Amino acid sequence: MATKIELIKELRKSTQASVMDCKQALEKNNDDFEKAVKWLRENGIVKSTKKLNKVASEGIIVLKSNLHKAIMVEINSQTDFVAKNQELKEFSDLMLEKIFEKVNPKTELVEIEKIQINNDEKVSEKLALIASKTDEKIVLRRVVVFETKTNQIFTYLHANKRIGVIIEIQGKLNEDDGKHLAMHIAANSPQFIDQSDVNQTWLQNERNIIRSQAELEVKENPKKAIFLEKTIEGRVNKLLIDTCLINQKYLIDETKTIGQFLKEKQAKVLKFIRYEVGEGIIKETVDFVSEVNAQIKQ
């Protein structure tokens, strides 16, 4: 468990809010990190979700695909140094090679861990061996498999192996267009394909936060009261533009939206997924002095 001081540090790093605001947010929410972030947003201290960069654990994204199938796995380690370890890289390449034909969209991590990859050695056993050599915890965190007989699959893995994307497309895109679309998703982090795909619970939660922020502004300037509902709707619409893929300006050609690009190509995005190393994980931090003292006492 992270200490109160560590939670304040992580909350401040994630939201850019002041130390006192972070302390107050945690106190009002029983040290619940996610609720504290929400409280900061509702009270206008953090205005935009784009500023909420979660503290990431280390690791790599690994990916293998052809036109009709793709698998993406996140492997977590405790340090960036181990994430770049040559043996871990060789293991991940071998693992993908051995498991690619054996997995399907219903495959779970526990099944992958049991697959033999080399001389009767299971994935879990090889990971444990690398972990013992590096003296770090190394785990498979999550996996996703796309598979289709009639549609196209495109992927993108960023050079640093920290971001990966898989898309399933209905229609015909050439290889460059498919890769560029995957790159766009990697760079712009859409959450939904279009408004019909939006999670309504999420949208209502965001609308409530936007309303709280707007009402605070009205308290500061009562003249804004007559524009309250229009302000809220405008901000909700902007949020939908930012988070829905087809509404976003196309990274490769900003004169058109993704929706316009797909219409020109007579193609449709059926689904996509974007992985980023450590997203959603709160990493515990230990200061250098404490770490040295702990080692001395061992």
Curated annotation (Swiss-Prot):
Metal-binding is among the record's keywords: no
Gene Ontology, cellular component aspect: cytoplasm
Entry keyword Zinc: no
Keywords: Cytoplasm, Elongation factor, Protein biosynthesis
Gene Ontology biological-process entries: translational elongation
Major site of localization recorded for this protein: cytoplasm
InterPro entries: EF-Ts_dimer_sf (IPR036402), Transl_elong_EFTs/EF1B (IPR001816), Transl_elong_EFTs/EF1B_dimer (IPR014039), Transl_elong_Ts_CS (IPR018101), UBA-like_sf (IPR009060)
CDD domains, sorted: UBA_EF-Ts
GO MF terms, alphabetically ordered: translation elongation factor activity
Region described as Involved in Mg(2+) ion dislocation from EF-Tu: 79-82
Compartmental location: Cytoplasm
Described purpose of this protein according to its UniProt entry: Associates with the EF-Tu.GDP complex and induces the exchange of GDP to GTP. It remains bound to the aminoacyl-tRNA.EF-Tu.GTP complex up to the GTP hydrolysis stage on the ribosome.
UniProt record similarity statement: Belongs to the EF-Ts family.
HAMAP family: EF_Ts (MF_00050)
Stored NCBIfam families: tsf (TIGR00116)
Record protein name field: Elongation factor Ts
Species of the source: Mycoplasma genitalium (strain ATCC 33530 / DSM 19775 / NCTC 10195 / G37)
Protein's gene: tsf
